[in-house]
Amino acid sequence: MTATIAFLGTGSMNGSIAAGLLAAGHDPAHIRATVRSEESRAALAQRLGDKVEIITTGGEADGNHRATAHADVVLLGVKPYGIVELARDIAPALAPNAVVVSVAAGVTLETLAECLPAGQPIVRCMPNTPSSVGKGVLAISTTDTVKDEQKRLVEEVLGTVGLVVEVREDQMDAVTAVSGSGPAYAFLLAEAMAAAGEKLGLDADTALKLASATVAGAGYLLDTNPDAPALRRAVTSPNGTTERALNTFVDGGLFQLTEEAMRACAARSAEMSQMYTADED
């Protein structure tokens, strides 16, 4: 891949994708990144190396214009409330065939299209935090202006940090509920297991180690075989300890509670889509 990739804002997600590209062998001379301060620049240079062009913007548009000019893919990595302003700022500097990728939650393709030149190829991405360790899930939706080869390029870029799945944009709220916020559910489960372990007589440190390692190990098994029901059945002996625990979970309403929580998450995602619009200011 010799495409030029620009990262506007290099927080956790954009920084992880840039690092993933370098680890995959992408030429650092074809990677540009913007930061707001010299302190951030020094930290990013330590992470990405001195061959990546890192531009300090100080909050001004000129730096983002420099990074954007002639780029094949432009990743917008600022917070959702800053996306509209950033998209408008870079619009004059975009090449007509540059693909603009937003990783901001709740910002729709329509909102982005209203800020960018007519016909600009746009991709909306919902990543999750395991992308920072190369084990993420990144759901994408695209405008009709994105060509197949451009989509493949974006998938190649994002694929350096995890699994890329294309969905319809009207499914993004559901995606947010499943994979976007999903890692926190696993963390909460580990937290609950550790708390219960303490009540059963373990010290706090041991309980947390056991719970965390167990959830991580189960995740690894799912990574190698994504058939959760089969994996569950394989470790559940009739009339055994695991069956007793699982029955307690199910009888206590685990499935119903999970659905309620995820519906709440999806509803909040839909609300956020109404908050970040091109006419917000």
Name what the model sees in each region.
Residues 1-69, 198-199:
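NAD(P)+-binding Rossmann beta1-loop-alpha1 motif at the extreme N-terminus of oxidoreductases
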Residues 5, 123, 172-177, 228-233:
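Short pre-catalytic strand/loop immediately N-terminal to key active-site residues, enriched for Gly-Thr
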Residues 212-281:
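NAD(P)-dependent Rossmann-like dehydrogenase/reductase catalytic/cofactor-binding core
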Residues 178-179, 190, 275:
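Catalytic, metal-anchored helix/loop core of enzyme active sites in primary metabolism
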Residues 111-121, 137-174, 186-224, 268:
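Internal alpha-helical scaffold of NAD(P)-dependent oxidoreductase catalytic cores
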Residues 17, 38, 48, 58-140, ...:
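Rossmann-like NAD(P)(H) cofactor-binding subdomain of soluble oxidoreductases
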Residues 31, 41, 67, 112, ...:
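Small-residue helix-packing motif on alpha-helices
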